[in-house]
């Protein structure tokens, strides 16, 4: 919503002053701080459900007012929590129709990069995020085409089975995808400076056309733009990462998305059993932390024993 100063746990005061100065000639009857909500860290009390809110959510009257609320989070905060990527030198990748990677930093970046967004963990620590508009949308469209083909022969393929079968088939493909290249841009992509998307599939005349290479090329494409942004962090900014955890729909088929991401990042990747639930799992943990945390217990300490025992799948490098 607005840059956070991790040292104070509040909005960046210097940037707020700059904003107010830039709009001073507009005659607005407010200062920016007056219209922004209060910043809350994970574990703090965010209020309770009102009678009006309870009626809005449940007209039957079963839902009662007074339910305590934790500070809300978007996909970024819930993704970090779901994968326990809230400590320095940890990170996570959320991959579905869009994809983003978030790395918890040890120190601020040395320069401004348009490909990188600065956010925070739910506890307020600085995080560098690479967000790409395009991930699996093009891939999903092709899987839909294969489902339509099967229906022509009277076969009603189970959606989950269809995805897992095609994803696993991709692992049989050549490492260079047999000379095939997929461009998965359904929409514009700020990371590469494109305002509109045009999905494309290209191959050389001597390419090895086959289902395995076709699927592998589209899985590679789903993470290719993410790699451009991550290379800025890893190579230009020399950001250090001890662990990366994947979650989201791309990782539902065991081992496949995990292997592709490991190749893209040149780093070991872990995936949790709750990979497909990502955000919902994360906000549930944040609510539990609000309810059950002990005095002085950090979010990271709370997540260690409570939430992740036996949940991490084997790591793939």
Question: What role is predicted for each listed range?
Answer:
Residues 2-33, 40-245, 250-311, 317:
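Active-site core segments that coordinate phosphate-bearing ligands/cofactors
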């Amino acid at each position: 919503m607005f840059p956070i100063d991790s040292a104070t746990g509040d909005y960046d005061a210097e940037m707020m002053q700059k904003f107010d100065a830039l709009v001073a000639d507009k005659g607005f009857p407010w200062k920016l701080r007056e219209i922004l909500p209060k910043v809350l860290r994970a574990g703090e009390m965010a209020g309770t459900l009102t009678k009006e809110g309870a009626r809005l959510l449940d007209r039957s009257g079963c839902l009662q007012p007074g339910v305590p609320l934790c500070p809300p989070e978007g996909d970024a905060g819930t993704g970090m929590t779901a994968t326990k990527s809230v400590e320095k030198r940890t990170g996570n990748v959320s991959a579905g129709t869009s994809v983003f990677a978030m790395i918890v930093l040890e120190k601020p970046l040395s320069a401004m990069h348009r490909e990188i967004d600065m956010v925070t963990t739910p506890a307020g620590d600085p995080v560098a995020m690479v967000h790409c508009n395009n991930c699996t949308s093009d891939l999903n469209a092709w899987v839909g085409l294969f489902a339509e083909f099967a229906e022509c022969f009277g076969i009603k393929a189970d959606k989950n089975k269809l995805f897992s079968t095609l994803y696993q088939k991709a692992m049989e493909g050549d490492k260079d995808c047999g000379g095939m290249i997929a461009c998965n841009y359904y929409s514009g992509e700020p990371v590469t400076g494109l305002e509109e998307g045009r999905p494309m599939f290209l191959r050389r005349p001597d390419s090895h056309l086959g289902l395995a290479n076709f699927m592998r090329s589209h899985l590679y494409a789903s993470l290719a733009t993410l790699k451009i942004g991550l290379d800025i962090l890893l190579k230009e900014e020399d950001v250090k990462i001890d662990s990366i955890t994947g979650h989201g729909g791309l990782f539902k088929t065991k081992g496949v998305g995990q292997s592709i991401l490991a190749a893209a990042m040149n780093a070991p990747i872990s995936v949790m059993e709750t990979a497909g639930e990502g955000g919902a799992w994360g906000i549930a943990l944040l609510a539990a932390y609000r309810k059950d945390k002990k005095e002085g217990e950090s979010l990271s300490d709370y997540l260690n024993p409570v939430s992740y025992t036996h949940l991490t799948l084997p790591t793939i490098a």
